Amino acid sequence: MPKIKTSRVKYPGGWELIEPTIRELDAKMREAENDTHDGKRKCEALWPIFRISHQRSRYIYDLYYRRKEISKELYEFCLDQGYADRNLIAKWKKPGYERLCCLRCIQTRDHNFATTCVCRVPKHLREEKVIECVHCGCRGCASGD
């Protein structure tokens, strides 16, 4: 007799520790997606979504790599279910990308002259005015800041 597949996801042990924070960030994400973008530039409408996505990924990264409070099974579950960005976390593990805000800032095809975003320039090399990234609104994510 074939097994019956259910749509219910089985959560690994330790999920109850991170669930309230994940649910809170999901609610913020829904609110940011439904928020009106009247008076904002086209690119500015997506900035809150990028910030919340970064915050959620950083939360899971810190729990697993820095504080070591969650198991590998729970960490992999969060990545597989889309609670954290696997590619962004992979970049955070490399030297020089520890504070990276989003993957679009390091993709050379999205920028003039095949370079990275202005937010990747260290603060001591910039001019005095504050510059925000066009993609995600970051003001600086270079590791030397």
From Swiss-Prot:
Q: List the disulfide bonds.
A: none
- Pfam families per record: BUD31
> Which PANTHER family does the record cross-reference, listed alphabetically?
PROTEIN BUD31 HOMOLOG 1, PROTEIN BUD31-RELATED
Note whether Nucleus occurs among the keywords.
yes
Provide the protein name: Protein BUD31 homolog 1
User: InterPro entries this protein is in?
Assistant: BUD31, BUD31/G10-rel_CS
UniProt keywords (A-Z) are:
Nucleus
For this chain, the family text in UniProt reads: Belongs to the BUD31 (G10) family.
Compartment(s) of residence: Nucleus
Record keyword Nucleus present: yes
Q: Looking at the UniProt record for this protein, which Gene Ontology cellular component terms does it annotate, in alphabetical order?
A: spliceosomal complex
GO BP annotations, alphabetical order: mRNA splicing, via spliceosome
